[in-house]
Amino acid sequence: IVNDISDKEFDKKVFRTKERPIASGKISIKLGLVYTATLCLFALLVLLNFNTVTIVIALGSMPLAFSYPLMKRYTYWPQLFLGITFNYGLILGWVCINNHLDTIPIILYSGAIFWTLGFDTIYGFQDINDDEIIGIKSTSIKFKKNPKLFLYTCYLIFITSLITTGLLMNFNYLFYLFLLIPTTHLFLYQVYNFNFKDPLNCFKIFKRNNF
């Protein structure tokens, strides 16, 4: 909701997003803020049931969540900030169960950031023409000349983080065997078939990351 409020004027100028509730005026900014405050209250009530370390770390995610929508105005790396924010739950889940932070969740978290960086770059290519006109920045624009190399790099870092996590957790060979499935999917299906000039193809491949 915060993202839609922040991007209201931008969304009006982009064909794909102009019908979003706040951009189209179906929901007012005031009502959007009420929804946001309500959701934050419920989230806080849930959070207070966890240990102190989890609560402190969770509160640290708030500045990330509220500053992310502004990043596309100032940097070509808003997708990186999305990854940092979106995957924060990996850290929280570990701390909630173990009551401390460790190397393993940090490695997994770092890898997941690059996964998000990759698939949201694909997502961004849907609007790249409109974004360039209105002045929005993104990794899609920054790497538009050779996006596949960038995506391969992001996904390689992600898969490497999973392998490293498996080694540190002493997983058996089945983990690495099943890891071939997402590896094949990311490299041979997503990146290989990615057509950054076709918005429908971009959205189709982006959605494949829900596996």
Which role fits each region the language model picked out?
Residues 2, 6, 117-136:
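Membrane-embedded alpha-helices of multi-pass transport/permease systems
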Residues 74, 99-106, 117, 121, ...:
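Short, structured loop/turn "capping" segments at alpha-beta junctions
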